[in-house]
Amino acid sequence: MLNAHRYNEKTASISRIDFTILGNKEIKYTSALGKNTPGLLKYEFYDNTEPQKGGLIDQRMGVTSNDLECRTCGLDSNFCPGHSGHITLAQPVFHLGYFEHVISILKCVCTKCSKLLVYKNEEDIIELLKSKKGKNRLNEIKNLVKSISYCQKANYGCGNPVPKIKAEKKKATIEINIVAEYAPLNQNQNQNPTDEIDKKPIKEILTPMIVYNILKNISDRDCLILGIDPTKSRPEDMIHTEFFVPPNPVRPSVRADFMSSGPREDHLTIKLADILKANQRLAKHMESDDKNLIEYFQDHVAYLQYHVATYYDNESLKLPQSEQKGVMTKSLVSRLKGKEGRIRNNLMGNQTLWERV
């Protein structure tokens, strides 16, 4: 039995609750699969009739049947709360829940040197730090940088032009991108500045890897000005490099009837299998020496990004809906929102047993 988690009857007082980003390091550290492992590697659910070790219903993440014991805590399904796992991604991908926040931060920093675009010693900034916090502070910084066109060298910047940051979702190619649009440069002095070619902005695709590195290089001081406490969360944690796998009791297997050939898996488990397959395909592609495959690299990244996005939200995104045998898969957002969701239907119900929540 793996001694990753042990429960006892000792109690302790709760001093406070901090709502922070579930970072990549924390996802790996709290995983029942081990923080020094690549996480789940097998998308098969069963080995003969037993849950596949290293698969998506690995018994180290909890059990959903009374005749089984959890391989982490040793408890049965009545008492085991379940334990989270993780998938180490071959390439970073965007977390759609933080997508707009990432765009807001990118508008406030240089895309080349990650420096904040405003002067840190301005009176406006000093007053801002005193009066605004969190999201309100970030919105104020966004307003201050609207008129800045270059990363100012006097502010220890690099002098790079400041682009317009936009989101781009392509339904035909299932791509989700962040685009940096730079003002057109007239390189030919003899060319008429009214020509059509001069009016086209210069576009740069900011891939999740590029965005991850930009956010990672933002200093702790700049994070504080942006309303982020770097001792609790870092901006790069809004980009997935490790993917959180919820415990088995959150997505239990269901046996339809005694005549069925086997258990029916939850929609979240099916989507996790899609993510795992896309991730393994991308990893094999990256290990290949075939130069002809290079052009398909971004397609594999986009495919992984698509399955991660539809895992969270399979309805409101401007993307093709993910389906399983002709039925739309139920995403994480679908479980939470609406009158039939977990919050209004379960947690706010009159018969909720709050000590179990």
Sequence positions of predicted segments:
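Conserved core architecture of multi-subunit DNA-directed RNA polymerases
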Residues: 1-357
